[in-house]
Amino acid sequence: MRIIETHRDLLSRLLPGDTVGGLAVHEGQFHHVVIGSHRVVCFARTRAAADRLPGRADVLRALAGIDLGFRTPQPLSEGGAQGTDEPPYLVLSRIPGAPLEDDVLTSPEVAEAVARQYATLLSGLAAAGDEEKVRAALPEAPANEWQEFATGVRTELFPLMSDGGRERAERELAALDALPHLTSAVVHGDLGGENVLWETVDGVPRMSGVVDWDEVGIGDPAEDLAAIGASYGEELLGRVLALGGWADNGTAERISAIRGTFALQQALYAQRDGDEEELADGLSGYR
């Protein structure tokens, strides 16, 4: 809770009505997120992440004008401008709910309900990707996205790996060569379980909203499907694919290739941001 002690006075002002000592903190890859009863405060972990905060707020404002069928955080205020003694921060509205508990999907009824809501979410993102105003507001994945990623990994991360780690990474990068350039849907970019919030209604989870839109863009929906599989396993992913009409070999191959890069993605972003903790975690299987 060091982040709370460091910014106690500021948090008292930004989160009126909350007891600072009782606040929870979520440690994300790019931000420390302090969670109040009605608002959350995002503090950047690194200088690079701080420089991206204004752009993050702009993206959330753009999303607010799109009917996605679920709630997204609304920017309320920003701080830490150059020339002030405040740390860079972004205050957002809080989406009620929490990530799913690890054991909740053991119930077939619950697993089916969760899969249906994920299929609805992804169908909504795909439909939004067809809207001209949405495509104008969000960045489109570049045609050479994965080639640039592979170059970055080889240049910046290979020197930090063991021989066996480089061999593993080469296999994972080789799988990217066959990926087509698709820009058919709004892609969240980090749709892991911690970023999808749920409330329980009559004993069944109901999706309340989606947070952490730092990497949103127009791209391949297989990226979000890969994150669902990494969070919840192949059985739930299979249900989502069947419900959404995506259970074809091409989609499965794209999901597998993208999922194989998740640790490398974490490590490369951390290396560029100067975040040693996230870098060490991402490279733990390559050293």
From Swiss-Prot:
The active site is at 190 (proton acceptor). InterPro entries: AGP_Transferase, Aminoglycoside_PTrfase, Kinase-like_dom_sf. It holds the Pfam family APH. Its EC number is 2.7.1.103. GO terms for molecular function: ATP binding; viomycin kinase activity. It comes from the Bacteria. It is an enzyme of class 2 (transferase). The keyword DNA-binding does not apply. The keyword ATP-binding applies. One of its GO terms (biological process) is response to antibiotic. It catalyses: viomycin + ATP = O-phosphoviomycin + ADP + H(+). Keywords: Antibiotic resistance, ATP-binding, Kinase, Nucleotide-binding, Transferase. Disulfide bonds: none annotated. Belongs to the aminoglycoside phosphotransferase family. PANTHER family: AMINOGLYCOSIDE PHOSPHOTRANSFERASE DOMAIN-CONTAINING PROTEIN, AMINOGLYCOSIDE PHOSPHOTRANSFERASE-RELATED-RELATED. The aminoglycoside phosphotransferases achieve inactivation of their antibiotic substrates by phosphorylation. This is Viomycin phosphotransferase. It comes from Streptomyces vinaceus. The gene is vph.
